[in-house]
Design a protein with these regions (language model features):
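Catalytic core and acceptor-binding pocket of nucleotide-sugar-dependent glycosyltransferases
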Residues: 133-234
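Short catalytic/ligand-binding loop motif for oxyanion handling, primarily in non-cytosolic enzymes
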Residues: 13-14, 86-89, 95, 114-117, ...
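N-terminal anchoring/stem segment of glycosyltransferases
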Residues: 1-61, 68-76, 137, 206-207, ...
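GT-A fold catalytic core of metal-dependent nucleotide-sugar glycosyltransferases
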Residues: 54, 58-115, 125, 132-133, ...
């Protein structure tokens, strides 16, 4: 398994890993067939509150679960991007855009928190640097690059589709929506959108169901927020 990670906080990343052989440096490449990062000793058990924990720890939980998901679904080439990188160091991601056809799966962390655990003031739908909007822009460029590589004339196809979790099951269970989904090459599942009474309605079985409806290996991207970490990968 191949994993490439882009992150903004090298020092915290290194401190969060328990073994010298597990240090992650941005950007990094690890072949998990020869050496697998062991995150099993992280002493966090589905915390109900994250206000006093370093957000980098949660990045490792996301990465661990992302790897498990990809292993279950035979996705072997993975990219993981800290959303802050997209906002602050966007140029560093140019090679991932260039090589987007190489990835089976791209995960994006959603971190609307400052280091003291408070919601960032910049986390606003009206803010041009909104992490979610920046993530969509990045994925749109990935999709644009895919179309270029395929020399496709299907420019009218939207480069990404975004669904709130509370609509996800409905979409999967209606044929007309499934037909529409097949026109997309990239799916983003947002499970942290405000206003949803139950942002955890979808499960790993729903994701598997969606994947099975495709024949052309779409990229499926998750904005994996703090609220769902104990449930998204159950």
């Amino acid at each position: 398994m191949f994993l490439k990670i882009f992150h903004t906080d090298d020092d915290s990343i290194k401190k969060a890993v328990l073994s010298d052989t597990c240090c992650l440096i941005k950007p990094m490449e690890i072949n998990f067939e020869s050496e697998k990062i062991d995150l099993s000793n992280l002493k966090i058990d589905k915390p109900s509150s994250h206000s006093n924990l370093d957000p980098v720890i949660f990045d490792f939980i996301r990465i661990k679960r992302m790897i498990e998901f990809c292993e279950e679904n035979n996705l072997t080439h993975i990219g993981y991007i800290d959303a802050d990188v997209i906002v602050t160091d966007y140029e560093k991601l140019s090679d991932m855009i260039t090589d987007c056809e190489y990835y089976d799966f791209i995960g994006i962390s959603e971190i609307p928190l400052s280091r003291n655990g408070n919601v960032q003031k910049s986390y606003s739908w009206k803010n041009p640097n909104n992490l979610f909007v920046a993530s969509l822009k990045f994925l749109r460029e990935v999709r644009t690059r895919q179309l270029e590589l395929l020399n496709s004339e299907q420019s009218e196809i939207l480069p990404w589709a975004s669904f709130g979790a509370d609509l996800f099951n409905k979409i999967l269970n209606e044929d007309k929506f499934n037909t529409v989904l097949k026109n997309y090459k990239m799916i983003i599942v947002n499970n942290y959108l405000k206003g949803s009474k139950d942002p955890l309605k979808f499960s790993i079985s729903n994701i598997k169901s969606l994947i099975s409806k495709y024949t052309d290996n779409p990229i499926i991207a998750f904005n994996v927020g703090f609220s769902n970490m104990g449930k998204l990968y159950e």
